Amino acid sequence: MAARPISIEHEALRLNLGCSDAHVKGWTNVDRCEPADVIADLSQRWPWNDSSVAAIKSWDIFEHMVSKIHTMNECHRVMKPGAKLDLFIPTTDGRGAFQDPTHVSFWTPNDLFYFVETYVEWQRFHVAYGITARFRCIEQTHLEYPNKVWKLRAILECVK
C-alpha cells in the first residue's frame, strides 16, 4: 500500500520510526539498531526536543512498544502543533497482531479513543491514566489483508 503524502513544511524534521531497512528519503530513519540515521530505544524518553517534529511515520512499530501510553505521549511531546502522525498497526481483529513473537502490545481501532480529543474515553480518562497525548483524527480505516491479517491505518493531527 503506497503511503499517502502528508503535507508538511520543507526542511522539517520528519521521523520514520522503526524503519528497519525501509528507509524513506528526506526523513530521519529511526530504529533500535543499524542501519538507521538515529539509533534510539523508543521505550525510553525520545531524543528529540519538545515540539520539534513536523511528521511521524509509524508503520508496523507500535505493536513492538510495551506501553501504548508512553508511546503516544512521546509522539505528542515531540510533535509540533498540527504535525501529522501516520499509523499503520496490525489489530487483534486478525492474526497479524499475534503472529510475530516480538509483538508486545495489542491494538484495536478503539484504542485511539483514549488519545483522540473528541472521544468520551479521552475526555473522561486522560488525566487519571496519565495520558498527555491529544490528537484529532484526520483519517481512520481498518483494512483486511491476506492470511486473516487486519491493520489499522490512521492519520492523527497533534493538538497542543
Q: Where are the regions that the model predicts?
A:
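S-adenosyl-L-methionine-dependent methyltransferase catalytic module, highlighting the catalytic core
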Residues: 66-76, 80, 84-160
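Conserved alpha-helix/loop element of class I SAM-dependent methyltransferases that forms part
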Residues: 1-12
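Conserved SAM-binding loop
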Residues: 10-93
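Generic detector of short, locally flexible boundary/turn motifs and exposed helical patches
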Residues: 2-4, 20-23, 122-123
